[in-house]
Amino acid sequence: VPVDAYYYEAVKWAAEKGITGGVGNGLFAPNQPCTRGQIVTFLWRAAGSPEAKAMSAFSDVADSAYYAKAVAWAVENGITGGTGNGKFSPDATCTRAQAVTFLYRAAGSPKVSGSAEFGDVATNAYYADAVAWAAKNGITGGIGGGLFGSNNDCTRAQIVTFLYRSVK
């Protein structure tokens, strides 16, 4: 991770806090898309890795998976309900809209006044309040050109930066 990268401080913080250990061999892989399993694990670790009351019932989350406790915690705390049909889809790439929504729900879904000022965020989108909250709290400024990039893959650098900014 280059020291002049926008995500340097966030990755350093996340590594020091045990939120991420990277992808192996001393690498973080900042531009690699983040999966749903990785994102809930980052959130869970940032929350102190609390024990869930029960493991999740998702058919695609084995109790032995590294993200199993994180998924159970995320469900218990209303952060995610899965992707339908009894699945969580832990290996699916997470979009920026999904990532910010997970973060917003982890923060307790605080009330937001107004809407996000991004041309690609419809006021009735499920993630509209989450994006507005993230923008108003300095968590994201979008991808430029007045856009949030709702359907773009969320990279590992982006989610760790969002998480870092949300707690600072």
Short names for language-model regions:
Residues 1-8, 16, 21-40, 44-70, ...:
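Feature responds to low-complexity, polar/acidic, surface-exposed segments characteristic
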